[in-house]
Amino acid sequence: MDRETLAARIDHTVLGPTTTRADVLSVVDDAEAHGMNVCIPPCYVADARDHASADRTIATVIGFPHGTQATSVKVAAAEHAHADGADELDLVIPIGRLKGGDHEAVTAEIAAVNDATPLPVKVIIETPVLTDAEKHAACEAAADADAAMVKTATGFTDGGATVPDVSLMSEYLPVKASGGVGTYADAAAMFDAGAVRIGASSGVDIVASFAE
């Protein structure tokens, strides 16, 4: 893997509750300088799209960070993000429904959001709060709903991406590893486990720590 390929597999991320427009535009500038994608709050998608080059991939989040919104609200948010210029959607599943055993509802929600726009949907399953059986069920729901990827975590619960979780998830769909990936060594471990994308607020550091 060369530096350009690495950068193209990173979603440089800013999603904190105090994120400002200036923060988002700074992340876009970093992404432009290094060849990364960005993942940003939905309220700034239009600003980022206006600021970024036409070929810069902009992802945003739906149902973030806890996944507790009604499905109709998530569908509307997906449609709004698409209209504002988003290229990809990172969707948080209804975690409580999964843990309560209502797997059909989880699948139906993912499918509803997936069908609402032509954008690829990366399904955030929040691995730190799931048992292995629940991780399998969440990934199966995402696969059954024709999602594009599964993603480990939001970063809003304790824990993040782990090699065993990425390996498990990659049995079902391509994996975005997010949470605690701060260096190239971290990213390489995730890629070796089966991840195809990294989500990180430290995207610049990951690229900078790469040695060809």
Curated annotation (Swiss-Prot):
Pfam families: DeoC. InterPro entries: Aldolase_TIM, DeoC, DeoC/FbaB/LacD_aldolase, DeoC_typeI. Keywords: Cytoplasm, Lyase, Schiff base. Gene3D superfamilies: Aldolase class I. SUPFAM superfamilies: Aldolase. It catalyses: 2-deoxy-D-ribose 5-phosphate = D-glyceraldehyde 3-phosphate + acetaldehyde. It is found in: Cytoplasm. Its EC number is 4.1.2.4. The active site is at residues 90, 151, 176. Pathway: Carbohydrate degradation; 2-deoxy-D-ribose 1-phosphate degradation; D-glyceraldehyde 3-phosphate and acetaldehyde from 2-deoxy-alpha-D-ribose 1-phosphate: step 2/2. Its main location: cytoplasm. GO terms for molecular function: deoxyribose-phosphate aldolase activity. It is an enzyme of class 4 (lyase). GO terms for biological process: 2-deoxyribose 1-phosphate catabolic process; carbohydrate catabolic process; deoxyribonucleotide catabolic process. GO terms for cellular component: cytoplasm. HAMAP family: DeoC_type1. Catalyzes a reversible aldol reaction between acetaldehyde and D-glyceraldehyde 3-phosphate to generate 2-deoxy-D-ribose 5-phosphate. Belongs to the DeoC/FbaB aldolase family. DeoC type 1 subfamily. This is Deoxyribose-phosphate aldolase. It comes from Halobacterium salinarum (strain ATCC 700922 / JCM 11081 / NRC-1) (Halobacterium halobium).
